[in-house]
Amino acid sequence: MINERINELRQLMKKRQIDAYVVPTSDPHQSEYLADFYKTREYITGFTGSAGLAVITKNEAGLWTDGRYFIQAENELKNSEVKLFRMGNKGVPTYYEFINNVVQEYGKIGLDGNCFSYHEYKNLLDNIGNKVIISDIDYIGDIWEKRPKEPNSKAFVLDIKYAGETVSSKLNKIRKEMSSQGIDYTFIGSPEDICYLFNIRGNDIEYNPVLISYTLISKNKAILYISSEKIDKTVKSYLSKNKIELKEYEEIYEDIRNIPAKSKVYLDPQRTNVKIYNSFQDRKSTRLNSSH
């Protein structure tokens, strides 16, 4: 079954002349744990561990994971062509080195930039020489039949006696720091940080009380980008009272495009996906500050 999926993927790669396709363990927010919808690496390799990365080429398929999962990976990969690369062991190439060994100069590397952190993308770019990265390819989504639905849990308000600090107090601290550094906008892509900031919770990821969402904070606005299906009247009223504007999840891209020229934006490249980061970069004159 896994080999059949890999062959389907290779057919799509061939059509677009992609030499290697990289599949991380990630979602658009670089969460440590994933909703079932985003378990693309598990789908293409059969490995169910919570950490790892896969690379599929024309003739090879590899999985990189750490020592916690060596035995599990051996068992789960044994009926497929996927080769286990034991990270940290002597003589085992990194996935960058593997790509350099099997893909020629100016070859094409494909990945889904929606589920790839800019931090890791930059590391990949810095380690593969003159190869070309195409970051708008969701091949796993194209071949995944009966894919689980996207997470859609209902938001709820965390009582202030548990939260310990009001939303306005937290926003004031952020805006004070923004002002001291001359920052016009702060982008937050981490669901746990967003839920902490706004004192809300959800169940979009099993055992993690978070909501898949983005936030953009300016001097005068705080916008929560989230599926409206997750927000009932009570939560909507609560957010409104706290001067938090609600917009649909996908509207983040349009708002990034509308950021005034020469604005200074703060973000975390480890928790910002390539698609979002590039949307900011496309503004040309927008200056990005990061935590790394």
Where are these predicted regions, by residue range?
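N-terminal accessory/capping or targeting/presequence segment of soluble
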Residues: M1-Q104, F116, E120-I259
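Short glycine-rich phosphate-binding loop at a beta-alpha junction
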Residues: K108-G113, S263-P269
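Acidic, metal-coordinating catalytic cores used for nucleic-acid/nucleotide bond scission
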Residues: C115-S117, R271-T272
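Extended, highly charged accessory segments
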Residues: D268-D282
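Conserved small/polar residues in nucleotide/adenosyl-binding loops
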Residues: T286-S291
